[in-house]
Amino acid sequence: MSVYSIRRIMLESYPILFICVLIGLFAGGTLEKSLTGIKGTLVIMMVPLLNGIGGNLGCILGARLGSALHLGTVEPRLKGRVLRKNVHASVLTSIGIFLFISVIFFVIACMWGMGFVMAAKHALAFILAGMLLTPVIVVSVVTLAFLSFQKGLDPDNVVIPIATSIIDVAAAISLLIVAITIVGL
């Protein structure tokens, strides 16, 4: 069977997408219950950004690992220079982007008339939520890539949909934990 047959792609994708729908419904329910009492507009603005950035970082790493597995430059085990460099690049990119966006949140908070301390707390909440999310991104993507490849599934059909769903849930939970702890919502 060809790696890129329509039948294989559909057979592997539909169950994965169904699982993603269930995870997405769980994430939505978690957010709905948790955000009901939160009055902070800035914290609510952080949710789609954290989900989007986290998902994008996961997609980048997932695509790179999927290609590396297909090309044979990465073996499905937790060693090797190519895997290590990809993980390091993902972590450094994550730190950079979450730090940059937290500065933007700080500026927005100050422009909205929020005091310096509260603006700093919001920026800190975003960067910490991103740092809590980063290991989830790396572990979920690497695990999904290796497991799907070992099971004979195409990582391109499995990793990104499931990883982004997991990342959405983890992003919401990490932001809620940090926002409640740091911002005091």
Where in this protein do the model-derived segments appear?
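Alpha-helical transmembrane segments and their membrane-interface boundaries
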Residues: M1-G115, A119-A123, I127, M131, ...
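Juxtamembrane boundary at the C-terminal end of a transmembrane helix
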Residues: A172-L185
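Transmembrane alpha-helical segments of integral membrane proteins
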Residues: V136-Q150
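Short hydrophobic "helix-edge" motifs at membrane interfaces and signal-peptide entry regions
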Residues: I44-M46, V142-A145, N157-V158
